[in-house]
Amino acid sequence: MTLQSSGAISLANIASEFGGSAPHSLSEYYLGHSGIPSSGTISMNQFYGTSAPSYVAASGGSVSTSGVWKRHYFYSSGYFYISNAGNAAGSNSVYALIVAGGGGGTGVGGGGAGGYRYLNFGVGTGNYYVTVGGGGAGRYSNYNTTTGGSGGN
């Protein structure tokens, strides 16, 4: 919850928002974000309207973690559930790599490649349905007049 933007602010208010170990002192809150310095002079008024970093929390698909990054892979259709949308002090957006299945081939020829999109966008909490399709079916023919199938959603 964001700290108030006016009025009296106490060390207890700051500790409630940002955590820390008692006994509290301002020096434990060098944050380096939201206008709060990471070193040097720090004052109570620098905390007005600030909030602790919050990051997107989500579930769904097959999940793997690499460092601070969490990846959700969808091999079949299903829900991507966002339980925490994060905030500007942490992260409130997601990156998506969407790869489409290619078309089917004919005879001895290969099919066309699928397209892709790389996106970065803000999210809100809730369920997002992910549709996974497949590539097009190939066709065998002694003649090159039979085409392969189109890829699906």
Label for each model-derived stretch:
Residues 2-153:
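Glycine-biased low-complexity/repetitive sequence motifs
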